[in-house]
């Protein structure tokens, strides 16, 4: 069988959604790869090199910053030289040597209205170009939910047999030790008395819902991590600082995020579009209640274990909502693990490899 070479460019970026997924899957492929069928090819300017036992790591002489040279020239050139197959985790595959590719969602294709500035429009054009190329020319497509799979099929008219669902997981959270210093740093945050959410610059994360809700409920406290304001267009978002019941935490570590999730009244994730949505899964793993948007993706993943809100309507009472009963999260936490995802991916890759 041919060797499968993984595009390690994700190691040059911060560990957010796709990057976290990529790293956790690689760690588990390393455990499964007893026959050295996989290799990780990384740019010279990686932020760190993971400790792997079986999965070979090769460091390139080139940096990632020469975008898009790495994805379309440097990486595929190495793959061709090794007479191997490429595996890309980040919504693209080489223009000239397409391989196996993960398309996590097709947000840029479906929500053009969210890309308003010239730079954003250019980025959207490139993303849509990559979606189309990867889906039409890639040897096989992987995505993270049945919802995303169906959207890809409907939008690009691709055969369902060409797409395999490999979901996200939460088990990386087990090795993170919570750091409650963040609670001491913000005296407004009393245990089980505040709501928590992750700030983001992406419009689809829908912080506008939380702003409107907070205005209507000054008695409730809301903690928001990350850079929730910079780069946003909406006047509602810019008003975050003026609301006394919103606590802007700034950057928080993974350890502090875990502490906030564990000690909040509920974790809120009001996105109006997601391909999967990992943070609510992380919150469930530490026993937190989760309030998520009533959208197809979340209904698929979280089923009856979540409290649902209309992402377009903040006229709800969260305290009353949280008094209702939801199902135990045990079954979905047992299912959505990176261990399970990596095993499914490994077996699928072996089968594909035998046919190429």
Locations of the language-model features?
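Carbohydrate transferase catalytic cores enriched for Leloir-type hexosyltransferases
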Residues: 1-356
């Amino acid at each position: 069988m041919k060797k499968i070479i993984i595009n390690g460019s994700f190691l040059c970026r911060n560990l957010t959604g796709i990057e976290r997924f990529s790293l956790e899957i690689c760690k588990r492929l390393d455990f499964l790869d007893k026959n050295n069928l996989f290799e990780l090819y990384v740019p010279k300017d990686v932020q760190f090199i993971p400790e792997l036992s079986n999965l070979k790591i090769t460091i390139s002489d080139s940096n990632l910053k020469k975008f898009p040279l790495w994805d379309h020239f440097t990486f595929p050139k190495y793959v061709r030289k090794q007479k191997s197959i490429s595996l890309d985790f980040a919504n693209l595959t080489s223009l000239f040597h397409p391989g196996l590719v993960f398309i996590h969602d097709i947000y840029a294709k479906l929500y053009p209205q969210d890309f308003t500035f010239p730079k954003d429009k250019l980025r959207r054009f490139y993303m849509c170009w990559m979606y189309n190329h990867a889906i039409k020319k890639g040897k096989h497509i992987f995505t993270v939910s049945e919802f995303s799979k169906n959207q890809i099929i409907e939008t690009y008219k691709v055969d369902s047999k060409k797409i395999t669902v490999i979901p996200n997981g939460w088990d990386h959270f087990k090795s993170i030790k919570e750091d409650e210093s963040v609670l001491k740093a913000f005296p407004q945050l009393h245990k089980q008395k505040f709501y928590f959410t992750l700030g983001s610059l992406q419009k689809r994360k829908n912080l506008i819902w939380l702003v409107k809700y907070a205005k209507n409920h000054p008695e409730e406290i809301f903690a928001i991590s990350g850079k929730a304001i910079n780069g946003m267009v909406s006047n509602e978002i810019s008003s975050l600082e003026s609301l006394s019941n919103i606590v802007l935490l700034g950057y928080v570590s993974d350890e502090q995020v875990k502490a906030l999730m564990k000690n909040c009244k509920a974790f809120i994730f009001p996105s109006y579009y997601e391909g999967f949505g990992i943070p609510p899964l992380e919150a469930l793993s530490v026993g937190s209640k989760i309030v998520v948007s009533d959208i197809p993706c979340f209904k698929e993943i979280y089923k009856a274990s979540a409290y649902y809100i209309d992402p377009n309507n903040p006229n709800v009472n969260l305290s009353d909502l949280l008094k209702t009963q939801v199902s135990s999260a045990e079954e979905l936490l047992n299912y959505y693990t990176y261990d399970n995802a990596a095993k499914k991916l490994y077996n699928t890759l072996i089968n594909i490899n035998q046919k190429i």
